[in-house]
Amino acid sequence: MPATAISELRIAVKSSLTPAELDDANALVSEARWNQVAADWRLFVEHGRVYAAHASCGRIVATSAILPYGQHFGWISMVLVGGPYRRRGLATLLMRRAMDDLSAARLVPVLDATPDGRAVYGALGFMDCWGFHRLRRERQEARRVDPVLPAGVSVRPITDADWPPLCAFDAAAFGAQRNAVLGALRGRLPAADLVAVETDRIVGFCLGRDGRIAAHIGTLVADNDAIA
C-alpha cells in the first residue's frame, strides 16, 4: 500500500456497526491479540464514540474510541491499526480526532498504554501517571475456595437492590460516575458478580467479562486489600 493512501481513507464516527463492520473490528482485535469481543464494541458505540478508518473497499482498517466519564475526563481506547496500514500516522490521526472531541467537550483525555502505543501517546503530550500489570492465570480445574474474610464482612452475589449503592460506592472510589459501563459488564461473567458487605454497607465489589482469549476479572473496587 503506498504511503499516500492514508489520505484517501475515510474517517467516520460510528453510531452503529453492521455485522460486516463488526467482523472488521474484531479482526483488528484478533490481529493485535487483544481480548475484546462484540459486547465491548457495543459498549463504546452506545455510551461513547467509535472512530473508524475505512479503506476504499469499505473495510474498516483502523479504529479508536472514547468513553466519557462524568464532566471531568474521558477514556481513549481501542486504538487499533491493521498490519498493512501501520507506521503511517494513522494511529496518531485517529488519536487526534478522539482528543479533539474530548477537548471540545472540556474533558481531559486519559488512556492506558501498551508498550507499542506508549511512544505514539507520548508524542501527543500524554504523561505517565501510574502503571499496572495485567496478569494471566492458566485454566485449572474448578474447585471451591472459601476466602478468609475480615471480621464482619460477607461476600455474596450482587442483587438488584445492591446496584444503586454499589454504583455510588464505585463513583466515590473511581472519581466519576460510570453506571452505564458497570451495567454493561454485569452478567457477562456471572461468577465474578460479587459484592462485599459489612453491616449492610457495601465495602467492595467485583465484576468481570467474557473475552476472546480469556475471562477478565475487573472492575474490582474495595475498601482495603483484604476485602479485595
Give the label of every model feature segment:
Residues 2, 113, 124-144, 209, ...:
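Active-site/acyl-donor-binding loops of N-acyltransferases
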Residues 129, 134-164, 168-170:
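Surface-exposed beta-loop interaction hotspot
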Residues 60, 88, 92-93, 104-109, ...:
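Conserved active-site alpha-helix within GNAT-family acetyltransferase domains
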Residues 1-10, 16-23, 43, 55-59, ...:
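Intrinsically disordered, low-complexity, positively biased terminal segments
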Residues 48-50, 130-134, 191-193:
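Short hydrophobic/aromatic beta-strand or adjacent loop that forms the aromatic wall/cage
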Residues 31-49, 63-86, 94, 99-100:
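Basic, Lys/Arg-rich alpha-helical nucleic-acid-recognition elements, primarily the DNA-binding modules
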